């Protein structure tokens, strides 16, 4: 069984009720943080997961709303890990991830220096190992495997999605993307697909062109549902709602998805949890 928790279902626009884009996937004793939107560690704390307890951080792409809290994750995982010889925190992402991590650690350079000077048991900077992928196997530990495939969020490139499998259960996390063959293949037969969605019917009515531009490289609710249908997934989990879903509007979004997908559809606020079991 895999457990999905929508830590942050928001967007680049700050929302008092929604943290930035981030999803937690738990597979047995392993915990994977997929993207690091603002407020993610507070949301993770609400479900009993601390930064030092993460098995790896998976980044779908390097847009600011998906990495806004990366620095906090790196520093907090370091200062709250009291092991004598802590293992490096794996960061898995597309090309460019190593540069972003290096720049983030440099930005926190003064803080890192202060802590090393103050605490005798902190003698080195945060131990991090970065792995960059565009496709193929990315993880195989203790019965959990992760596979990567490219997505299409152009002009943001490269971008990737993840397929996590454990004990016969599988979940795919698409990140921001328009429909594409590589995502269909990655998600083929998965038990669950976590997909970011926007309401293009609403966004196109907003006068500012910069806002309308987001329709170019995100999937609508119906497009995400059609991807789920083509891939033959069991459950569609929607997240990263643009615009934010208002109180009582969940069924509108669910109904739109149901025009393209007849399976289970999950629409939830932050901390919404979905158990994923292998389909028999």
From Swiss-Prot:
Cofactors required: Zn(2+)
An example molecular function term from Gene Ontology annotations: 3'-tRNA processing endoribonuclease activity
Enzyme Commission number(s) of this protein: 3.1.26.11
Superkingdom as given in the UniProt entry: Bacteria
Residue positions of the active site: 65
Keywords: Endonuclease, Hydrolase, Metal-binding, Nuclease, tRNA processing, Zinc
SUPFAM superfamilies: Metallo-hydrolase/oxidoreductase
Keyword Nuclease: yes
Catalysed reaction equations from the record: Endonucleolytic cleavage of RNA, removing extra 3' nucleotides from tRNA precursor, generating 3' termini of tRNAs. A 3'-hydroxy group is left at the tRNA terminus and a 5'-phosphoryl group is left at the trailer molecule
Note on how the cofactor is bound: Binds 2 Zn(2+) ions.
Functional description taken from the UniProt entry: Zinc phosphodiesterase, which displays some tRNA 3'-processing endonuclease activity. Probably involved in tRNA maturation, by removing a 3'-trailer from precursor tRNA.
Subunit structure: Homodimer.
Protein name: Ribonuclease Z
């Amino acid at each position: 069984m895999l457990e999905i928790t929508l830590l942050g279902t928001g967007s680049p626009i700050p929302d008092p009720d929604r943290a930035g884009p981030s999803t937690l996937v738990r597979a047995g004793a392993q915990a994977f943080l997929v993207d690091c939107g603002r407020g993610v560690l507070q949301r993770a704390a609400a479900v009993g997961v601390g930064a030092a307890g993460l098995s790896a951080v998976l980044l779908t792409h390097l847009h600011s709303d998906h990495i806004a809290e990366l620095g906090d994750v790196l520093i907090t995982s370091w200062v709250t890990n009291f092991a004598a010889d802590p293992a490096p925190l794996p960061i898995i992402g597309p090309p460019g991830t190593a540069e972003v991590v290096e720049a983030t650690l440099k930005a926190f350079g003064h803080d890192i220096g202060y802590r090393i000077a103050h605490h005798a048991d902190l003698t080195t900077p945060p131990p991090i190992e970065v792995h960059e992928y565009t496709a193929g196997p990315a993880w195989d530990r203790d019965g959990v495997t992760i596979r990567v495939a490219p997505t299409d969020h152009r002009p943001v490139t490269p971008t990737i999605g993840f397929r996590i499998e454990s004990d016969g259960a599988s979940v795919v996390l698409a990140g921001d993307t328009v429909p594409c063959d590589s995502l269909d293949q990655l998600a083929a037969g998965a038990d669950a697909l976590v997909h970011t969605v926007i309401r293009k019917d609403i966004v196109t009515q907003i006068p500012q062109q910069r806002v309308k531009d987001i329709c170019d490289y995100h999937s609508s609710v119906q497009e995400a549902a059609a991807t789920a249908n083509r891939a033959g997934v069991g459950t569609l989990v929607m997240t990263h709602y643009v615009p934010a879903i208002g109180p009582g509007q969940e069924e509108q979004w669910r109904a739109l998805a149901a025009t393209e997908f007849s399976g289970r559809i999950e629409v939830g606020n932050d901390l919404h949890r979905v158990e994923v079991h292998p389909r028999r």
